A protein has these predicted regions:
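Hydrolase active-site cap/lid region
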Residues: 298-356, 376, 390-391
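Catalytic histidine-centered segment of alpha/beta-hydrolase-like enzymes
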Residues: 416-428
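N-terminal cap/lid segment of alpha/beta-hydrolase-fold proteins
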Residues: 110, 160-201
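Alpha/beta-hydrolase active-site loop
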Residues: 253-274
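Catalytic active-site module of serine/aspartate enzymes centered on a nucleophile-bearing elbow/loop
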Residues: 425-446
Length: 446
């Protein structure tokens, strides 16, 4: 049995109960059903397209740009306003100066704003204005990161901007109370970068969330995705890049099937932190983290709760449903420049020539896991827009029906609360409410 939650007009309904303590539970919520009749036509068209061809960057509300790929990237940036990653005036000022659909214009304008914020941060720090310095460093890091979204790895600026993302975040982390510290996980002959921020630096073990990103994330993205909410809910926050993520591909570290070996190395390190309670360690994976983390959980029983947004049981079958798999090379060559740039940048993370975007399909063969080997409690969060895709829905069903635990829940977040896109990046508050309310219940049970 599994618990299914649809956020609707009156309540959150548990369609079927997964554990006795969760039976008949109802949570008051003002959300609207995602099939509202006043949905814009472009959203309806996108939902219809999503049913047949899965596109992670398909949006259901247009925020500013006509170029859909660019508008999705802008949407992701806007989602970080609530977590300190951007200011609405700055974001729309930059957007107003970008040539719609141009990767170069996008890079140039976001880098300009990042430089302004970094200068402001340094001045504030020099003058002892630590709060201003921290907030400015955070935004500088995120604006540098946003500039990199459409930049190819062979661009002379690529590595330099990558370093700026890290430097600004490290400086911001020093100014938190308690600080968010940068640390490294030894793995084979390299190190995996991470951030750690405890609720309090007092040596007392507490609930902890380890966040693992997806197919195109940096640990800095994960900070803006959920760090602030994690601390607010009383959990320590940790995030680490695994091979393929962040700047690791520039060192020759591309995605690998065996994420259990990478996450084992991470757990070996973080479980030595005094503030981490080994009995209350949850791990959250978004996007292709919905493969990376569950794969590890089939082996790693030190993971006490698992959250995904959403599950990817078989990468190959999912990638076969994506636009680059279904389009001919001739069609791909005619893609809008921004879409081609973003897709090529992700292709590089798989260890392929960036131009070989179709090669990603074959590259993902064997990226699978057995849900039956996962025995900890599981939460699966899916945006309504993604869930309409047949393969996405099928993989969620395969995942949940075959888990080795009866404590399993799926939540479908709604379009008309601005929570329907990939990883619910546009409504991180709602995503966090769902996650931590569930997780509080799990750890309370114990």
């Amino acid at each position: 049995m599994r618990s299914t939650i649809f956020i609707t007009l009156i309540t959150l309904f548990f369609i079927t109960a997964c554990a006795p303590v969760m039976q008949n539970k109802k949570i008051q919520d003002g959300a609207l059903n995602s099939t509202s009749s006043n949905t814009p036509n472009n959203a309806i068209d996108n939902k219809s397209a999503q049913k047949e061809t899965y596109d992670a960057h398909r949006a259901y509300t247009r925020y500013h740009f006509e170029d859909e790929e660019m508008d999705f990237a802008f949407q992701w940036l806007l989602g970080s306003i609530s977590t300190g990653g951007a200011e609405i005036g700055e974001a729309f000022y930059v957007a107003g100066n970008i040539e719609d659909g141009s990767p170069v214009s996008w890079q140039t304008e976001w880098e300009k704003m990042a430089i302004r914020k970094e200068i402001r941060a340094k001045e504030a720090l020099k003058n002892g204005n630590n709060i201003t310095a921290r907030e400015s460093y955070l935004k500088a890091s995120n604006y540098y990161r946003t500039a990199l979204v459409s930049m190819m790895p062979d661009n002379p600026k690529f590595n330099g901007i990558g370093k700026k993302i890290r430097t600004c975040m490290v400086e911001a982390g020093k100014l938190f109370n308690p600080p968010m510290t940068y640390f490294e996980v030894p793995f084979e002959d390299v190190v995996l970068p991470g951030y750690y921020r405890p609720v309090k630096k007092d040596g007392q073990p507490r609930k902890t969330l380890l966040m693992i990103g997806g197919g195109e994330t940096f640990i800095e993205d994960n900070v803006f995705y959920i760090e602030q909410q994690t601390i607010k809910y009383g959990y320590n926050f940790i995030t680490v890049d695994i091979p393929g993520q962040g700047m690791l591909p520039a060192q020759g570290l591309f995605f690998r099937k065996d994420t259990e070996t990478q996450i084992k190395a991470i757990l070996d390190v973080i479980l030595s932190f005094k503030e981490v309670d080994p009995e209350k360690l949850a791990v959250y994976g978004i996007s292709n983290g919905g493969y990376f983390v569950p794969r590890a959980a089939t082996v790693e029983k030190r993971i006490k709760a698992l959250i995904v947004s959403s599950a990817v049981v078989d990468n190959y079958l999912m990638f076969k449903e994506m636009p680059f798999a279904k389009d001919t090379q001739e069609q791909i060559d005619k893609w809008p420049a921004f879409k081609k740039a973003v897709t090529s940048a992700v292709t590089w993370r798989w260890g392929l020539d960036p131009e070989d975007v179709k090669g990603q399909v074959e590259q993902t063969k064997g990226y699978t896991f057995d849900p039956a080997k996962i025995t900890c409690p599981v939460l699966d969060i899916v945006g309504a827009g993604e869930y309409v895709n047949k393969e996405t829905e099928r993989q969620q069903k395969e995942f949940l029906d075959n888990l080795g635990t009866q404590n399993k829940t799926i939540v479908i977040t709604p379009e008309n609360e601005g929570a329907s896109s990939h990883c619910i990046g546009e409504n991180r508050t709602l995503m966090s409410e769902v996650l931590f309310d569930w997780l509080d219940g799990i750890f309370k049970e114990e």
